[in-house]
């Protein structure tokens, strides 16, 4: 892997300009020696700080070349628009952005460690996102809120499915490997986020998100939730900080490829995982300016939490360590 980036920016009065360029080269070895990809990224931004309007606009250009495949070019618009109506309690906003993500074997194994070896994608996943809504701060800054709707177009979106060996109605081996398939997906989302600060060192946070998916280009299930949410409370002191919260996620469903060991017949089923509730806690102790001791716990109510079908996390998990800043 070879990766390099450069960025330059200039501000003059209420205006600012920024430009960025990046290059990434990925190459496989041994069983993956046929894989070679180069990704060139260039971005341009212009921003202005006005009395009523705060605006930043621009675009991102990507040149994506995978060996033995025709090169692809993508242009993704970028917008950040905030309106000042004279009150902190009501601030409309509009946002557009996106991303291009390569699907090398390295990237796919980071997303799913049960990936069939060796597999890589000859196309990158490309997202185009838009959001609009309102936000603000009321009650003398003690209550912040953000309510918005979002829409995404996801080209070459990854749909993961598991592979099983069956014999009749009996599953001989479940979830042996997982494979990605690609198709376009569109998503409409409705989101609400609030933060309440009854005191300067204490805050509570609540988030609720609902999703409507259009997966018409494939018959595969997307493995994504129709709803997720979170509620947490945090104390941030000068030396000690701690918090607790619960993260919720609706049922999810993946497709399941089944091969009959006796007849050789192929079919697709589905795997559904239950509603998830994850109770988490965290604790930080700032021993000195550069040293912090921390402890984190998750799944404290011992639920089966699935990031992938067939492979749940069992029991509570704890992490204890030291953070050092120099």
Language-model features and meaning:
Residues 1-4, 34-40, 71-77, 124-130, ...:
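Residues that define the transmembrane beta-barrel architecture of outer-membrane proteins
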Residues 14-16, 25-31, 52-54, 63-69, ...:
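Gram-negative outer-membrane beta-barrel proteins
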Residues 43-165:
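Long, internal scaffold/assembly segments composed of regular secondary structure
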